[in-house]
């Protein structure tokens, strides 16, 4: 085990380490992430949780970052929660017109004449980040305020969704609209995929949708061996270097890891980097003593 890995793990578990002050430990833990930020030219927020030991890795974990499309995972979870009280909801057909097809609606645009079921829209929103599908589901839940209310109901006081696709992608620095924190995202994801926030059948459906995501191969998934199961949801705003990914990772022979990586940059034309997200995920996994790649 590397010195860095030991220090991160010890710091996160709040164990004393002779010869190191708390400040020295914090600096040693933060240094690799700070270097990655310097190379990126922006800010990186990370929160990772080992559900077996309870250890965590945290860097800018309480700061707000734009959600971009990552809200769509929680949107699908909210739909599943409602389906627990509303029998047949997932099989309900939703018809929509051409005016619903905002840019990047790769699945919903194929079914303009037939419509899609709520379950099909949910899968499209999670696995293909389909924007029209997300807006149609938001409408069913009472808009952005309805999704925010669902997140409050599971104990998340940080998440807020204020706008619809595509407006929510503005990612203006300092704007609290349509944001959350890496820690809040990770903790909510844990509740929904591994905890009791959803009943068992709905929880399994949510996990299956996340595992089937097609947009995250170069983000957190790139930081783990190919034979580990991963369920994730990405987001990319397209401005201010803003992108993200959150995931549940099932390492072979140990308890799941839940983590979130969010990025932002100061200038509107700054580019996001999938490689930076993958690198941050590797650092977080290393800090938890997990051998990624």
From Swiss-Prot:
InterPro entries assigned to the protein according to its UniProt record, in alphabetical order? Beta-lactam/transpept-like, Beta-lactam_cat, Beta-lactam_class-A
Binding of a beta-lactam, residues = 69, 72, 104, 129, 131, 234, 236
Please verify whether the record's keywords include Phosphoprotein: no
The first-level EC class reads hydrolase
Name its GO BP terms in alphabetical order: beta-lactam antibiotic catabolic process; response to antibiotic
Keyword list (alphabetical) reads: Antibiotic resistance, Hydrolase, Plasmid, Signal
GO molecular function, a single term: beta-lactamase activity
Q: What does this protein do?
A: Class A beta-lactamase which confers resistance to the beta-lactam antibiotics, including penicillins, cephalosporins and carbapenems. Acts via hydrolysis of the beta-lactam ring. Has penicillin-, cephalosporin- and carbapenem-hydrolyzing activities.
What is the protein name given in its UniProt record? Answer: Carbapenem-hydrolyzing beta-lactamase KPC-2
